[in-house]
Amino acid sequence: MKKVLITGCSGLVGTYLIKKFLKNNYELHSQKFQIIGVDNNDIKIDVVYTGFTFEKVDLTQNDVISNLLEKYQPDLVINAFGIKGSPIKAKEQPVDFLYPSFKINTEIIDQCFKRNIWLVFMSSVGVYAPSDKFVEDDVWKTLPSENDWFPSWSKRMGELLLEAYKIQYGYNRWSIIRPANIFGAYDNFGEGSTVIASTIKKICDSNDTITCWGDGSPTRDFVFGEDVANAVFEMYDRQINDTVNFGSGEEITIKSMVDNLIELSGKNLNVIWDTTKPNGDMKRQMDITKQEKYNLLPKISFKDALNKTLLYYTSKISNNDLNFEVYKFLDKGFYVGKTDEIIGSDKTEFFDKIDSLVSLSQTKDNYAYRLDYRIPNETVNRYPFYVFGDDIAKRDEYIKSKNGEIGQRWWEIYTKETTSSEIINELQDLKEYFRKITLEYVKKIYPKLNETNIQHHDNFTLYENGDFIEPHRDGYNKGRYCVVLIYLSYEKNYNDGGGRIFINDYGFDENVLPINENFCILDFTSNNPIHSVEPVKNDFKRFTYLNFIYNKNETEKQDDK
């Protein structure tokens, strides 16, 4: 197993780098990695995963970097350390921007050279002087912009030091990436933050008017942190020993960015442009010729990336939790395994009520066949969860397991909390149990599902807040929606005392901000299954994409059918 050490792992790009590894089950092109994250700040993700080690250290202290590399012996170092902030903040606190970066960059480069470790060095758009387009080879012909004067010199000197080691010692085990204006979910949203982060905070804090600096006419090349992380991995994987810009290929005005965020927020806000404040550089646009040559182009659209960033911040300020009420089906009275018999409710009326709530809905005639596992149930427990690779976990367990020693797997603990005597043995190993549920077996349970339905149903993809998913389904569930909550649920069946463990994601078509502010209660027993205020209405969707029915007798009956 290889090891990667990420400095600056609590920063915007550093967090995406960690999550990229976790999302790929610690793999990069089939190669397993152990991840070591180091920073002088706490990490921004709220779990500690198996295979991930975090050390909170002051990287500016003597011998800290040397000791870390000696301790972990990494195959790859990604230097994502950087200090982000507005041009005003950089001018007012130049030492805070220049000294830490300069010292850390110098030490990391020297230690990676001495150990012959591959280094990905994250530079910055700030190294360039103002011009119509930023070309890699033009950096050393001019001086940096005065708006990035101090931060840019630390990055420039890091690049120059790598070139020096290459010339004098032949050290060429490095890549330099120069991202454009980076933004994303794990940015700093306080005072003095970068333009997108500060605009999001203003929008969320206001109900009528926001004030933005300048006149809105300057243009920027914005890139999403997740795309930057993907490019970093590609540069290492392909051993690109070069300095490469990473831009979007788009030129976006500040005004357009603000307008997009207001639209996504669902708010009706006035914008005051304060022309007494500086515009900053009028244009920042990366030349992406070399980037295209290496096929390192972004994959996430600007608007989708804004939406994900906005959703992260709105979830953060509401304590990362939407107020979902536990739902019940106590009055439905369905018979287990019956296709046609429904007691206690008019069939048509009831199906109309649940049409937008039951996942994998192909035809109404097929509902009853599945309702024994989906409808006459009560949610007993519910936990937010993450799926990465083949593992699923409650956050609490991984927080308690800082060294990656989980102890019991989550379902072993979970079944002790519920009714472990009724859980079949196969659940002791989730992956093995899932392999036993072949496509043919799933088809027996859900006979009208087609191939694409089942492929979506049995995947292990991590869906996060703000992700957009386009399931390959027909009917109500067809289309594009935004995930706002994913949870693990245990249900018991009132008819036979059995139950199931399943995973759902909740998503909406509409703007994310009103959903976070307004969505309040799910109650399937009322006439209107969604209780919320405008504009959410009935745009709620639920998809079950991992489902374990563990009533052994009933699953055997299904097998016999």
Can you annotate each of these PLM segments?
Residues 106-148, 175:
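Conserved Rossmann-fold NAD(P)-dependent oxidoreductase catalytic core, especially the SDR/UDP-sugar
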Residues 321-442:
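Non-heme Fe(II)/2-oxoglutarate
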Residues 2-26:
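N-terminal Rossmann NAD(P)H-binding glycine-rich loop of SDR-like oxidoreductase domains
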Residues 128-129, 149-150, 177-196, 219:
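Flexible, glycine-rich beta-alpha linker
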Residues 59-100:
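NAD(P)H-binding glycine-rich loop region in Rossmannoid oxidoreductase-like domains
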Residues 467, 477-480, 489-561:
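Catalytic core of Fe(II)/2-oxoglutarate
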Residues 146-175, 201-206:
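Active-site Tyr-X1-5-Lys
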Residues 205-318:
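C-terminal substrate-binding subdomain of Rossmann-fold SDR/epimerase-dehydratase oxidoreductases
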